[in-house]
């Protein structure tokens, strides 16, 4: 896809109709919520805490609004930096199974996130979940390349929507990315970037704590 943003747009266009309720995280990425609202969706904010979403609020929406999707940045949440706990991930998936909505996992920061962080789609094995990610955060911002993975029964609808939208993604960019992956350059670059960010995070936390700041959750 043309970045993770287009992947999210494809999911919305393929699976939703104007007026459909969609659960989103509060706070969260304002661009995604504005896009959903512009498409005529009913945006349902779910408070996001250090461990995950407010399950009581989700339960209430499920019982009264019958949401179609729950859009979540589960790892390195924007803007809080929270990472979904394994227990919360299981709770979300159980609710998705019970009420029939899909969890859209926006894993934009996957290349710089901790390896041990739980992913909803890994736990779920793409039954009630859709995985979205991209490469702009780790390679070049102007390389708008992304991808999505979805349950088999949704793939054809998503592919048709992609073809009707942009037909294809620029081939030279795809080939350059494929070469980076085949030669191991992407993996090595991501490892160096994670090390650099870990050092910067440690210094930043120490400076903030020395200045009297405290954190609700570990950055």
Language-model features: locations:
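Short, conserved active-site loop motifs that form the nucleotide-linked donor/cofactor pocket
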Residues: 101, 129, 213
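A structural motif corresponding to the C-terminal end of an alpha-helix
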Residues: 95-100, 207-211
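Short, surface-exposed, low-complexity cationic segments
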Residues: 67, 215-216
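Conserved core of the PLP fold type I
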Residues: 1-99, 111-126, 197
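PLP-dependent aminotransferase class I/II
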Residues: 130-209, 216-218
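Short basic/aromatic active-site micro-motif
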Residues: 2, 218-219
């Amino acid at each position: 896809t043309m970045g993770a943003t287009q992947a999210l747009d494809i999911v919305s266009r393929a699976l939703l109709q104007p007026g459909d309720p969609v659960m989103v995280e509060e706070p969260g990425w304002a661009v995604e919520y504005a896009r959903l609202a512009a498409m005529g969706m009913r945006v349902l904010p779910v408070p996001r805490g250090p461990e995950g979403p407010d399950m009581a609020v989700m339960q209430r929406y499920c019982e009264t609004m019958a949401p179609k999707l729950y859009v979540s940045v589960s790892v390195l949440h924007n803007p809080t930096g929270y990472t979904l706990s394994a227990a919360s991930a299981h709770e979300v998936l159980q609710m998705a199974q019970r009420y029939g909505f899909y969890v859209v996992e926006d894993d934009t920061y996957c290349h710089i996130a901790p390896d041990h962080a739980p992913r909803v789609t890994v736990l779920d094995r793409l039954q009630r979940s859709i995985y979205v990610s991209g490469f702009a955060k780790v390679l070049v911002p102007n390389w708008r390349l992304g991808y999505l993975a979805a349950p088999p029964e949704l793939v054809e609808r998503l592919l048709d929507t992609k073809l009707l939208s942009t037909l294809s993604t620029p081939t030279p960019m795809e080939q350059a990315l494929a070469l980076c992956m085949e030669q191991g350059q992407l993996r090595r670059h991501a490892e160096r970037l994670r090390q650099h960010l870990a050092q910067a995070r440690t210094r930043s936390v120490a400076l903030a704590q020395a200045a009297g700041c405290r954190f609700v959750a570990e950055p």
